[in-house]
């Protein structure tokens, strides 16, 4: 069995359980994905299954990408990602992998690109408290304060939390519960929120710690 799938975030909604309890869920359009390559220890040094997702016109891909995909079934696919599998050699290029890979109640890890926030200060970016609001304070309400000592070390330490570009990073949220699987619509409902904006690409994997 392959341990993951590619999909797109559709949005969030309320889901009512059989007990009548409302829980927040994220709706994900997961798959179908196509197996495009099998990685083997003899040839590649590791085992994995490469999946392709989302058909696209050939002109939008480079010649090497087109050649790679023609050798594995001919469908032109926008995204290629690799996933581990119980037995990679049990799968063949061209095989279709659907959302039925997952079951309700299962735990999954979901990775995506977080929303970009642009240049942000330390209060928003790192949760700094800021300076005092009164007693003569005039313009340092959201300033970081001191960023280091004096002569020793005479520099700012690497990794010092400062203002800068926020968001747009790869983020993984672990152990999200699968609430419902809808194979006919290729939809996956998971409890809680997932990284990124609507329509963002997601990698859904079997939970490592679940």
UniProtKB/Swiss-Prot annotation:
PROSITE patterns for this protein: RIBOSOMAL_L3
InterPro entries (alphabetical): Ribosomal_uL3 (IPR000597), Ribosomal_uL3_bac/org-type (IPR019927), Ribosomal_uL3_CS (IPR019926), Transl_B-barrel_sf (IPR009000)
GO BP of this protein: translation
Transmembrane helix recorded as keyword: no
Region (Disordered): 125-154
GO cellular-component term (any): cytosolic large ribosomal subunit
Residue ranges of the TM segments: none
Oligomeric and partner information: Part of the 50S ribosomal subunit. Forms a cluster with proteins L14 and L19.
Family in the record: Belongs to the universal ribosomal protein uL3 family.
Protein name listed in UniProt: Large ribosomal subunit protein uL3
Organism field: Chloroflexus aggregans (strain MD-66 / DSM 9485)
Taxonomic classification: Bacteria, Bacillati, Chloroflexota, Chloroflexia, Chloroflexales
Encoding gene, per UniProt annotation: rplC
């Amino acid at each position: 069995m392959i341990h993951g799938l590619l999909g797109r975030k559709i949005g969030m909604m309320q889901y009512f359980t059989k007990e009548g309890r409302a829980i927040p869920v994220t709706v994900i359009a997961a798959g179908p994905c196509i197996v495009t390559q099998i990685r083997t220890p003899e040839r590649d040094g590791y085992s994995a299954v490469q999946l392709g997702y989302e058909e696209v016109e050939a002109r939008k891909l480079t010649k090497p990408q087109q050649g790679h995909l023609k050798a594995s079934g001919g469908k032109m696919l926008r995204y290629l990602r690799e996933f581990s599998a119980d037995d990679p050699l049990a799968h063949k290029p061209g095989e279709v992998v659907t959302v039925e890979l997952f079951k309700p109640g299962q735990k999954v890890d979901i990775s995506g690109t977080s929303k970009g926030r642009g240049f942000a200060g330390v209060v928003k970016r790192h949760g700094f408290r800021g300076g005092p609001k009164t007693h003569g304070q005039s313009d340092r309400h959201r300033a970081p304060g001191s960023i280091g000592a004096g002569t020793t070390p005479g520099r700012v330490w690497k990794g010092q939390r400062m203002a800068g570009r926020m968001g747009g990073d790869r983020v993984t949220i672990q152990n999200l519960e699968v609430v419902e699987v809808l194979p006919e619509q290729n939809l996956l409902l998971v409890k809680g929120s997932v990284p990124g904006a609507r329509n963002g690409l997601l990698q859904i994997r079997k939970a490592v710690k679940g």
